[in-house]
Amino acid sequence: MDIALMAMKKLRAEGKLDDMEVSDEINACSIVVPVEIDHEDGKGPVMEEWLVFFKNETHNHPTEIEPFGGAATCLGGAIRDPLSGRGYVYQAMRVTGAADPTKSLKETLEGKLPQRKIVTGAASGYSSYGNQIGLATGLVDEIYHPNLSLIHISEPTRPISI
């Protein structure tokens, strides 16, 4: 999320993100959007300012230790904050990273779970939680690199909500 926030702050300083909400939040970014609302009073449509949240959550360590539960609670944590702010979470994306999951189990680092177990368990945990609450996941991508053998990267799980 730091990469995204740094880019947003730079663009805002350059005057290119006038619709970005300025806050102390470090795990999310929000933009202000005008929304036309038909009120029940019959006075016709009214324009209101709403926030679109882009929320990030990481659960690298929990996912590395217990992949299913770590990834499930990652998604749960990512939706918790928008919901507590009276938001509505309507989709998520999952971009994660790991070392080569096709490596032999003999190549697993001592004291670590095999990459294959982490990758498959995390994918199952994430999809299980999302399916149980009815959250659509529009993007799932897994990046493999040898340097990721020390930890499973579960950043970002980013629900998009309003």
Language-model segments: which ranges?
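Extended, highly charged
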Residues: 1-60, 117-133, 144-146
